[in-house]
């Protein structure tokens, strides 16, 4: 059945900001789908609030709305654009929930919009836990196996407590309906835990419903990815097995494709159940993902859940098999059937052929517990990882070791040196699933644990345990051999050992091992991911390395540019860097180069097989990159390697690559050092005559104390060379300085600690610019809403700046040019300034693409990353202006007066983390970056743009109700006017005694509320935290002070997170919110597409 002719335009809903559980994989699937639909001649309308995505680029859809993904805003877009259909299955849970609520409240019917890709009945059957139970029972009646875990549905805490007895006692699993990434779920071992987990679950579920289930801890966990069309063709795209048993969320588990430990009969059984379920649920134009548990003792199969949409696993399955699930789902949604869709990779086979794999894929999660030191690091059914790396090998051991190496984290690879630990202690530690459990298991094996002991402690399948023993045996052979011969090195390489690991075991430097290996002629070959185990020829070069026989890299004539990606997402280095890499690939391809992408992150657009001419799915380590450069140099000429776009990961390789004779283009490694190294950068500033805050470098506590005494407190303390502000802190007195140095840093002459004067009350400014060696193009000037001292990645900012004048911009332009010239930048540079009093201080400069590049590009309608890639390879700004890649005149510092105002807001993952006592993690922002993603609000005035950014990040600002205010003494004066505005808008104020007193003296009424530390009053008056928990507060303003009032504030802020009440922690944010509330109350908040904004800007420029 060919494409439907009754659909001319489609609205696609994206997934919004990157949060834990819903990350870059939805940008990847959404981008693919928009392209396919556009190629089919449909008008594509997209809504997504996340500016760091490729899908929100103006060329991907016909009309792109960077607006909050809420039913109210989506309705405005539908009213304006009048699409025929709505496709909600590509934007994760956010899109699905929004679509369902718009179906339920009649908006879709009112405007005659049809849901495609999944019908409401199918979505409900898949997502509603009770209905899904019915589906599984119906399947069991038909085919005789597959069942659900025993469970009860609860709508109140009383139901929950009673439910435990029905199931036969603890432990029980709590799962809320319609949430994602396991939000609000967990294992409860006693009543206290149950009350806490179920309480949060009832709050998070949009239907206030949780399911209690019997515990299946320790069972084996599997997933199947399936697709079905309306002719009832079903394909099983991929089977995935979790290395960790049940009890760890699949997003936090190491996973393997294809499944390794299923017998053929068990696999056929899972297939039968899966196919029966997709039919019973009624998914008939798209894909779904089904999770199973198998009891290792008797083979009982339990169906855990299904997602009737494109999911995190489908991105992994697409990258693992080369079968583009999202692309095919989009085609099915507009009426095609599987047998009509050709396979892009072979061009011979249709999509109804199931992919076959002649390799093994391993995904390993990347965590960020170091950012939340108080959080409980146990892995549970709530997802906590922030990113993932994927590796491909010819066998499991090779893929596993490559995946662990790809995580780029200290201690992520297996270590076979160092003292052997105590077996009993290590086994006891391995019982609790944590981030590095696989390494603990390896240490236990080193300490003499047997396979049975490891299985009893961890319940990890004996086959996997056996593979770990095999890796350990190879390490022992390496250690005991008299000399390193060719056979031994080749064997170690086939099991995934890196040169560094071999060197560690033999007591040699990594480069020495590499020399020996090359002298013996042992190098990897590159194999193709072809979907068909080499039965048909593959047309797309998508490679992985292996120590095998023949290489499949074809010769080429065009000069190649190798772009190094950013590896697994983490806090501080996310999708924004991937965005710049993808843009570089597009721009250089247009300019006649062959583009080669190197990356190992399965969630991203950069690792899509049609983003670049060639893709290497490999770890970003020096060894792996050098081998790729070698393989490509045999294939044809290399124009250079780009390291400045992928964040800190490739930047850290630049000097070593250059030392190995690799041509690094753009900013030179020496220039990178001049900006990153404190001393060298200080000299650049001195030559340009620019002030920086007073600072010093200390290698002992005595030195640090002396510097702090001279500069004066508060001071900012941090280790040198860091991304995302790791380990920074604002220190107010000497005792805290002493504890910071003893607790948190390895301090030594080679690893000094930097002590800076902390600029209180300064305005922080971010600048993105391009420099070609002679001319500067100012990309954009962003003014931060929060004051200096909050990491720029966590602060909201506005572009164009809202309070800076023409004179300030002139100074910023001159300073930026001075620094770019002094450092020697070719391409992008990002500089952070602080304006304190009348002095413009330089805080830091990064000679690379920054995380604000996508935001700046969208806000000013100029593709900065594309321009940067061209400049790295020799183009000048003047040439790019003539070509039309940059505006003919003016730049981001001279935007027209009526340019729209864009506000970027950071999104935090607070609700995911709890400490071991189950308390939340404090939400106060500081100099260490903790956000996982961002949203953008764009409108003609600041108030509305800010209100949109808040709605996109945390849910809409309240326009009336009760506001609670409690601020530090230093903020009391500046809080009076915004507080008076809130009253004018009809808010009722509540405040703690100190704040209420100041308000009253200024003629503002506020009800006094008890602090948490004062406890409940004699007549049962509630404390503020009780008011929040009881849902009696709509807005919270709470600024932290010192360390005394810290605890009260902490209780208030964590309660706000648990109940999802907007909580502002700075007076600046309150002032912005008041402008936003004002804009909302005066109604008429409209929506405009990026294309309309861009037309307006371009017209004003000419």
Curated annotation (Swiss-Prot):
What's a GO biological-process term for it? Answer: glutamine metabolic process
Q: What is this enzyme's EC?
A: 6.3.4.16, 6.3.5.5
Query: Where along the chain is ATP 1 bound?
Result: 129, 175, 181-182, 214, 216, 221, 247-249, 291, 305
Which molecular function term from Gene Ontology is one that the record holds? ATP binding
Which residues does the record give as Mg(2+) 1 binding sites? Answer: 291, 305
Q: Region Carboxyphosphate synthetic domain: start and end of each range?
A: 1-408
Question: Where is Mg(2+) 2 bound in this sequence?
Answer: 305, 307
Q: What is this protein called?
A: Carbamoyl phosphate synthase large chain
